[in-house]
C-alpha cells in the first residue's frame, strides 16, 4: 500500500473559482480510477505527488519552499471518477533563451509518471485550464486561416471553406505522376497536402518532386486565375533535416513562398518538432497532422489524454491548423459533439468539458477536416459544425470522383455552397453537374444519406 500523502497533496476546501481568479495555477481534470483495494483520495494525492514535487515516501531534503509548489488535488468524485488537480505555474520548466513555457514540461508533469503508477488503474486527462499569464508565455500560432484567405483573394473574416485534398495513393507515385495528380486537383480546388508518409522516398525524392509540384501549381494558377496552396511534409527525426527540406522548398517556391505551408506530424514527432517549425518558419502556415494519436486519445483508451486536449495543446504550441477528425461524418472515430474541439481552438473563449477557457487574443488554430469525407457528407457536417471556416482535405472524395480530380474538387466547393444557401442537396445537384456526379461516384453514401436519389436525379443502375 502506498504511503498516504493526502494531508500534503490534497486540499478539498480549495474552490475552483478562487484558483481561477488567482491566476497562479494550471488546472487539470482527469478521469481516474484506483486499483482495487486503494483509497480514492490517497491515490489521487499520490498521483499529484508524482506529478509535482513528491514520490512514494517522505524525503529529508524537502523544505517549506518545496511544499509551496506542491500540486494539490482540489476536487474528487469517486462515483464519476472525476479528479482535478491544481499545478502552480512555478512548477513548469521555462526556456533559458527567452523564459517561455514549453509543452514538453507540461506533458512531463501532468501526464508523465502518473501514467504508470502501481496504485492507479487508469488516469486520463480530459481538460485543462491555462491562466492568462501562462497563455502569454506560450508561442501560440504565428499565422492562421486569415492568411490563407488573403492569398486566395477572400475576405479575411469568415472567408469560408477551403477545398483541399491529399495526394493519393498515399505512397507509390513517382515525381511526374505526383505532380500531375496535384495539377489535376488544383484545376478545381484550393489546397493540397502531402499525405503523412510522403517525404523523401527513393522513388520520389524531394528534390525532384517539389520543383514539379511548383510547376504544376503555376500552371493551374495560370489556367484558373486562382491562387493555390501546398502543404509540404517536413517531418523528420532531425532538426537539420526538417530545415533542409523546408529551406529547399522555400527556395523553389520563391515568389510564391507564401503559398507554401509546412506539415509536421506533431504527435509522433513530438512538441519539439512543432516548435521547430513554428519558430524557424513563422511566416509559413504550420499544419499539425496527428497520426498515431488514437493510441491514447481514443475513447476506448482509459489512459493518456483526449483528442480535445491534444487540439488545445496544439494552439498553445503554435499550430496554425490541426486535424480534428470528421465529427462522425467521415471514416474516422468521432461524434457530432466533437465540434467543441473546433470551437475551443478557433474562438477567443470557449467552454470545454470542464473548464471555461479564455485565450486573451491568441491567434486561432484552424480545424482541418479529413478522413473519408466527400461532397455528399459535407452538408451534414457543416450543419453540425454551424460554419464552413475550415480546411477540408478530401483524398478519396476528390480522386474518387467519377469524372476527374478537378470535378471532385468542384463538387466539394458546391457542397459548401449548397449548405451555405440552405438548399436541398438533391435539388442543388440538379443544377450543379459535379455535385450531381458525386452521387454516382459514392453511391453507398448516396443511398444512406439521400434515399431515392436515383429516381430524383434520373440515374439508374
UniProtKB/Swiss-Prot annotation:
Its EC number is 4.1.1.39. Mg(2+) binds at residues 193, 195-196. The modification N6-carboxylysine is found at residue 193. Signal peptide: none annotated. One of its GO terms (molecular function) is ribulose-bisphosphate carboxylase activity. Binds 1 Mg(2+) ion per subunit. It comes from the Bacteria. Homodimer. This is Ribulose bisphosphate carboxylase. The lineage of its organism: Bacteria, Pseudomonadati, Pseudomonadota, Betaproteobacteria, Burkholderiales.
Amino acid at each position: 500500500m502506498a504511503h498516504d500523502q493526502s494531508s500534503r497533496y490534497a486540499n478539498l476546501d480549495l474552490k475552483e473559482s478562487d484558483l481561477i481568479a488567482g491566476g497562479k495555477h494550471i488546472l487539470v481534470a482527469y478521469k481516474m480510477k484506483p486499483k482495487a483495494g486503494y483509497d480514492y483520495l490517497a491515490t489521487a494525492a499520490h498521483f499529484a505527488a508524482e506529478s509535482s514535487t513528491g514520490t512514494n515516501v517522505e524525503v529529508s531534503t524537502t523544505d517549506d519552499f518545496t511544499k509551496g509548489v506542491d500540486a494539490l488535488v482540489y476536487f474528487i468524485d469517486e462515483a464519476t471518477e472525476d479528479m482535478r488537480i491544481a499545478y502552480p505555474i512555478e512548477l513548469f520548466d521555462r526556456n533559458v533563451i527567452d523564459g517561455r513555457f514549453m509543452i514538453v514540461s507540461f506533458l512531463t508533469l501532468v501526464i508523465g509518471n502518473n501514467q504508470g503508477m502501481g496504485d492507479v488503474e487508469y488516469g486520463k486527462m480530459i481538460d485543462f485550464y491555462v491562466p492568462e499569464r501562462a497563455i502569454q508565455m506560450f508561442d501560440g500560432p504565428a499565422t492562421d486561416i486569415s492568411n490563407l484567405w488573403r492569398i486566395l483573394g477572400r475576405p479575411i473574416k469568415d472567408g469560408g471553406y477551403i477545398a483541399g485534398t491529399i495526394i493519393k495513393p498515399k505512397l507509390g507515385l513517382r515525381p511526374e505522376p505526383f505532380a500531375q495528380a496535384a495539377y489535376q486537383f488544383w484545376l478545381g480546388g484550393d489546397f493540397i497536402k502531402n499525405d503523412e508518409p510522403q517525404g523523401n522516398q527513393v522513388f520520389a525524392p524531394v528534390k525532384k518532386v517539389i520543383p514539379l509540384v511548383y510547376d504544376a501549381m503555376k500552371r493551374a494558377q495560370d489556367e484558373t486565375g486562382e491562387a493555390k496552396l501546398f502543404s509540404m511534409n517536413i517531418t523528420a527525426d532531425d532538426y537539420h533535416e526538417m530545415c533542409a527540406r523546408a529551406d529547399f522548398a522555400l527556395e523553389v517556391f520563391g515568389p510564391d513562398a507564401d503559398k507554401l505551408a509546412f506539415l509536421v506530424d506533431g504527435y509522433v514527432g513530438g512538441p519539439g518538432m512543432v516548435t521547430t517549425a513554428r519558430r524557424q518558419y513563422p511566416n509559413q502556415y504550420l499544419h499539425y497532422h496527428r497520426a498515431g494519436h488514437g493510441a491514447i486519445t481514443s475513447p476506448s483508451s482509459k489512459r493518456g489524454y483526449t483528442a480535445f486536449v491534444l487540439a488545445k495543446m496544439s494552439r498553445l504550441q503554435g499550430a496554425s491548423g490541426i486535424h480534428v477528425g470528421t465529427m462522425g461524418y467521415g471514416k474516422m472515430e468521432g461524434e457530432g459533439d466533437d465540434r467543441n474541439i473546433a470551437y475551443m481552438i478557433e474562438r477567443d473563449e470557449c467552454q470545454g468539458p470542464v473548464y471555461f477557457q479564455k485565450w486573451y487574443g491568441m491567434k486561432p488554430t484552424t480545424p482541418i477536416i479529413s478522413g473519408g469525407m466527400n461532397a455528399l457528407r459535407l452538408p451534414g457536417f457543416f450543419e453540425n459544425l454551424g460554419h464552413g471556416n475550415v480546411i477540408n482535405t478530401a483524398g478519396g472524395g476528390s480522386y474518387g470522383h467519377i469524372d476527374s480530380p478537378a470535378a471532385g474538387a468542384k463538387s466539394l466547393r458546391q457542397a459548401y455552397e449548397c449548405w451555405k444557401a440552405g438548399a436541398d442537396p438533391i435539388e442543388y445537384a440538379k443544377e450543379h453537374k459535379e455535385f450531381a456526379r458525386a452521387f454516382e461516384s459514392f453511391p453507398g453514401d448516396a443511398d444512406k444519406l439521400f434515399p431515392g436519389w436515383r429516381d430524383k436525379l434520373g440515374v439508374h443502375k
